[in-house]
Amino acid sequence: MPHRYLQELTTASVVAAQQRYGSRPAIQRMTANWDTDATFSDEEAAFITERDSFYLGTVGENGWPYLQHRGGPPGFLHVLDPVDGHSVLGWADLRGNRQYLSVGNLATSPRVSLLLMDYAHQRRLKIIGTAHVTDARDSGFEGLLARLSAPGPAGRVERLITVKVQGYDWNCPQHITPRFTEAELSDALAPVRDELARLRAENQALREQARQQPGRTP
């Protein structure tokens, strides 16, 4: 359930929209006893470290939002030690197309939104927080660089980005189209491959038997 997420994002205009469309009383009842802790439980931490991608939203000084996809091996997005009662995320930011839109936006507005998807199980985790960018060449951050560089990003690490979490929310599974990674499909198809191998071997044995019978042509 939301942890300080709706509290941070429910502005006066949002309240007005909820009132207009009739959801305000239900929202108030639903959020009456919600926890406002900004730290992840083991469930969120496990979900985050299992992801191989996420979407990062930033806003430029001209007011335009920007959405970027970030990907890597499972575990490239790290849950670090909490700071002042807030969970902290971190990842090694690699050299990409060198437009630096997200990095430039963060220089003037450190607030970010992250969306983490598990398409196979129709789950998504929304996170908001404040980001801090550290140049990977700066001295004094060797420990953080080593930690965020695991499990081995395929590229040149230019920056270390950490996010102090302000709130998060598990979203409902409605309208999430199931999609599967190559590894997930491989596991699911393993019995099919085994059965296919067995049938091929059985077919080959029958062909050999037929070939050995006089007057029979396989």
Predicted regions and their residues:
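Binding-site signature for planar aromatic cofactors or substrates
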Residues: 1-218
